[in-house]
Curated annotation (Swiss-Prot):
Family matches, as InterPro entries: ARM-type_fold, RIX1_N
SUPFAM superfamilies in the cross-refs: ARM repeat
Protein name: Pre-rRNA-processing protein rix1
Gene (name only): rix1
Chief place of localization: nucleus
One Pfam family hit: RIX1
Superkingdom in the source lineage: Eukaryota
Keywords: Nucleus, rRNA processing, Transcription, Transcription regulation
Source organism of this protein record: Schizosaccharomyces pombe (strain 972 / ATCC 24843) (Fission yeast)
Signal peptide feature range: none
GO cellular component, one term: nucleus
Amino acid sequence: MSDLLERGSLPLVKSWLAITFANEEDLPFQVPQIADILVHQKCIERLGTSENALSVRKNWCTSLTKMLQSKDFRIRWSAIILIHCTISQSWDCLVEHGATWAKLLIALLNRPETPKTLEIAMITVSKMFSSTVGRPAVTRELVTPNLPTFVNNCLRIAESGKCLCTVCSCLYQGIISHSPTFRPFVSSIRNICIKILDGEEVVPSSLQKKAAVLYASLYRCVGKGNFEDYWKQSIISILKEYHLTLDFLFQFVIEPQTYPTREENLMFPKLKGHYEETYQKALHRCRTLNLILISFLSTKTDKIVLLPINALKDLIQRVYTVQLSLPVKSVESSVQALLFMVLPHLHTLVNELTLKLFVVIPPAIILSFDSYLDSLNDCLLSESTHTGVLCSSLKLLSKFLDVTHMNVPLSKYENIVTLVLEYLANSSKGLASKSIEFSKNRGHSQKKRKTLSESQAGDTLMSSEESHQLYDSDVMDCCFSFLASILTHSIALPRLLRTKIDLCTLQISLSNPTSTVLISMHNLLLASILSPGDSQAVIVPHAIRIISGPLGLVHPDPLVASHARSSMQTIESLIHPRFPPLQKHLSPSEFENTFESRFEPVSLENQSHISPPQVDSQSEYKESSILAPSNPPFETESITDSTEIEGIKESFASTDTGLQNNSTATSENKRSESELTMSNVLSNEGDRNEEGSEINSSQPSTINHGTDHINIVSENKETTVSLLHGDVEVEETTNVALNNSQDTETKFTAIDVDFVDRPTSVVSSQIENINGDENGNTTSSVVETFEKTTDVVDEKTTSINVEGNGEDDEEEDNISLPSINLESDSDS
């Protein structure tokens, strides 16, 4: 096989046709190796265009067609895999034989094949259909006659409960590629999704996510004219289902506000029965609806869609307002206990939905995040023992701090930080007590045992098993990430609180944390080092000991070791900074040449013809220049006598002394004139800046950051949104539009936005004063030369003004640049 690989693709394919395909009994065992070579070597694509190569390719496709009609299911399975590898690299094979293969593969879906054969057949047909996008001729020949039959067969397989993940993936791929053809099958596909999501059977989370994404993509099957309206109607119908489910769960709670909903055009079956029997099903439906809403916000949209942002905020606020302290109706204690048991799960779902909204359209959440912080405080204080509430709340707060870089007041998160520190302290105490018990039991048991090797092995197993059961690594990871965000973005923390954070970090390092927790711990140590603050002790030596020891560089996990290596490089750059190299010392001759090339000699004779530079008051910070004389500065003949040279030197020295005295005397007389000139220039610049600010205030403000930007514009009733990414984790260009309207919708273009520090601008100004001496000669002296670095957007000058009248939300971004004060220096 290696010799054939070295010769090229043509001999290799010939050998497969002559030897491997002829032996059908051993063919299924050779298919994995052949498929791997086809994928990596691109053998069919590299056959060439010669007559011999075209003949070999035709024989290859004909052999696959014959194998696909075999009676042996193993041969059919082998043919499907090889067909999938062939169409992935050869467009000619797809055009010539794709229609025949598609009919045979779709016919296989009606046969009692094995689940693996059905899955690979559906994947291959879906690959054929998606490859014809943008080619109308091939689409009419291959897709149009075969796609309806393929969809019917897939739905029949899904109803039987087989290959559900593959069916959802293939249907979603078909909707993305050929959405108008799926219009007759919208209701059937929706019923399949509801059966998977809201059924009584327990399904894996991966299947639930695929079904939710498929449900959120059905709006594409409508005509192009109703694209945006159907997307909006779909998400509003899910919100209506959510409110109806909450009505059932909160039927015994006296809510401060009512949310009436009409029970019409519902997609999910109505909840019936007693509260004790149906509350679990209602909670499961809330999880399903929350997953569908997140899928709507995450999937890609080809056009701008309308997002009812206020309706989503109402849903979030409704769940947040229901706390354990709210009054309830006179019900049995068992029903009240069930209600209190449901609340933490609902708060976790709302935290996840808020986090997704914050990723998709940050301005809508930032402007109302103050009320969310109060609700999060109440939830965490009353439900701190629930892992989901704690993790989701900390993730939301960390994301808010990392994206906005805002200095939130300490009163907003002080209780949350205290709660996190208490959790870490309890975890460290539990680890310490368990380690003491293990050591005592090990010492007592070693006396009874006969062999040392058995005791060491048993103690090792016990300690490793117990150490992983003492705390939840996900919760520890969220706690460390939240504390790192607090240290990074909080300017002033109390000394006691800051000391507690460092102590808890060091105490947890004494245990045996997992790899994920170790990486978060390294980030927290770096955040503590990079943000010193007011603390009682220095944490740098302890951080170096942890990161360079068994919990860092020497850790067996390569991810932990690589992260520790980068952390150590950061710490080393802080402790031992490297200054730039010194410049090479020049010889006297080179130094004189460099000096003469940079400075021109000033003429001491005939300076009356030099005109002073004209200061243009209409230009912005233009540098004045001294005009050099047209004649050569020195017209000398060859000097050979040393006495003449000494006399010339003395004359130059006396002339320089006179010039310095003259310039000192005239600078005192002309100081008022220079100050007047500076004030005139600044007044002109101030008027110009005021005019520019008035002009810019009427235009939409834009905040640019690399490739990510936010365009805040004013529209009439709605704000537009276009979700340009199908994956939640991908960050791309963001265009967010906020409105000054009375409508409850928002149009957006977006997935994720990041706010960073703004670039700085260097402003330089050089103004020269032309002084005259008693003889009428002019002398140019620099009045002021300075450089001032200012931030283009400062925290003190940046403000977001939000004004609202009743239910109308009016959102504006007013960004003002800091003024630059230029004052003349009297000592210039």
